[in-house]
């Protein structure tokens, strides 16, 4: 995306100022180096990039209003702020505006523009963190290097192969649900789905089967499994680890601890700790709180992962437990991800909540379809 490229090129132009260069030589003066880039991006009529640049250290700011004074921390306030002269940046940095436009799939409404700004912000802050990490370390951090999703799909197929010749009625029903999910994953287009499976119907593995088959068929990047309670997350994560391998499954919630038990650095734990920062793992198991609060956060550390939610399959387990008081922003977020960011979302439960009217109202371009009709009994 050219707006992301523009944000990357302009975000640190304030460091060209004499004051900041003095700081590099040991001066203790404090220099605001992000406002200059935000002002330049806004001058170039790129407000989303201006928001991202302004907040890449301190947090995504409120927009405020054109009447805000220069001392206000809002974007409009900072656009009026006097900055240290730094014009020499233009000798080395020459951003191109020929294609720096909002992507066509982003609707021209406030919510869509806000989500696009957050995604742009996520790209910028994650790239900035990674670039700083690479500069400060003497060797590359142990990131990436995961098995491709196609390999994980084969691991799953090997795991379920003995199940496909069921010996009793219950197992035949489970097998039917599993096979339907595999077929749907390969054949269905990206979109919004429900998976209504009775208790004991093998919902966890069947939903994983759909997700991996779908991700491979549509060249998606990862599978994200969103669970409402930490009390049930460990069991799901253990199931996935037993099938796909511990190294390929990232469990991220308040109770997940990746600190080493002694002074020695555990390479596997450290790798997972790094992955919690930006969700670059192939399979992620997280909580609804972590997922939705990150989508609506303004802090760089929480927002780093957002761009890695794009181009994914997201399974919402026990969707009927989405809190009523937060239902509107949750549904709006799911709608944005599916409509604009190549996310396939599955609402997975034994008893579907009545979300169809909300999605029809908030995301009218989406149609909600059941993956396994006639399996409720």
Task: Locate the predicted segments by residue.
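Accessory nucleic-acid engagement/destabilization modules that flank
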Residues: 1-159
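Pre-Walker A (Motif I) flank of P-loop NTPase domains
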Residues: 188-194, 221-222, 280-281
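Inter-Walker segment of RecA-like/P-loop motor cores
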Residues: 245-296
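SF2 helicase catalytic motif II
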Residues: 284, 288-292, 300-340, 345
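Interdomain hinge/linker at the junction between the two RecA-like core domains of SF2 helicases
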Residues: 351-377
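Conserved Walker A/P-loop ATP-binding site and its immediately adjacent core
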Residues: 220-244, 253-256, 354
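Conserved pre-motif I regulatory segment
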Residues: 160-196
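Walker A/P-loop
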Residues: 188-211
